[in-house]
């Protein structure tokens, strides 16, 4: 018979196997930050905290960032319930979750070394799906290996009175995490204060939707006859396109730092779409003269669903997952180094003095700054 606490939504018999999967995955990551001179204390036998130290000799700084995934795993849950494939999609969801914080921390020139996660559910029953739990743990392991960070600790609360997903999804956790990055030597710190008129804007291609604009995608998909099972011209369903994992830009930034490129600012292409380019509060105009290929999901939303272009550009990354602001003299070298590191980069525009906005010349549209 279940305990009174289990009947109230917190069942440790379901939670414990999940925790052990995550702890086991985390232990396999502890050596990953060694390549950056950071070492995890492996004598800590629980997941209540991660203890780490820097063994290098360079003067250094630490950078800490916390970010949540948002609603993207709601789509994963819908697909798991309805697409008939048995795929949970949670390996890629784990990567999305971690990269929300990781792609932010590198904007300061910090390289990720430690990550802690939170998987908050509405009911402990969610933890009882062994396949989904295994996929999530494996996804966290894989992204830690890719970017060079450890997962020494985490949190997995059951919050029945706080977390209740919208139907038809019956259960979905709130996913988030905190990353610590190291800036070594400390002179590699990038604050954005060097951004200036004349700088070139280099855009790095996204893999697709990433994790912004999800609420709009869900709303519009549920209005379609086949919802997330709607077939797109790519041969994949709308749900499959939406769940393509976020791209990591760690290797790109690490390459530029290693080659001592004069980067004036770095910017993740996340909230506010292309309009986020005008994040700096100074009176700069961001003139975009060229653009990357637009992912098919965005084209579908514009052409088949009829979403106005202004909404598209202010909601989605529109094909650019990261921006680099560099002096004109560095633009060509940045694109070449990025290609060598495996990224598609394009010199898409220039920073100019003027009204704070984004002039998107390929479509003849002017976008206001974030929050407007």
Where are these regions (language model features)?
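Conserved helix-loop functional segments at active or binding sites
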Residues: 28, 71, 104-107, 121, ...
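Short, acidic (Asp/Glu-rich) active-site segment that either coordinates a divalent metal cofactor
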Residues: 186-234, 238
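Glycine-rich phosphate/pyrophosphate-binding loop regions near the starts of catalytic domains
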Residues: 34-207, 367-371
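Buried hydrophobic packing segments
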Residues: 51, 101-102, 217-220, 252-256, ...
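Gly-rich Lys/Arg/Thr-decorated short loops/hinges at beta-loop-alpha junctions or inter-strand turns
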Residues: 2, 72-84, 229-237, 282
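Glycine-/charge-enriched secondary-structure boundary and capping motifs
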Residues: 2-10, 14, 129-150, 156-173, ...
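N-terminal amphipathic/basic leader segments beginning at the initiator methionine
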Residues: 1-35, 39
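Active-site pocket-shaping loop/turn-to-helix segments
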Residues: 87-95, 236-248
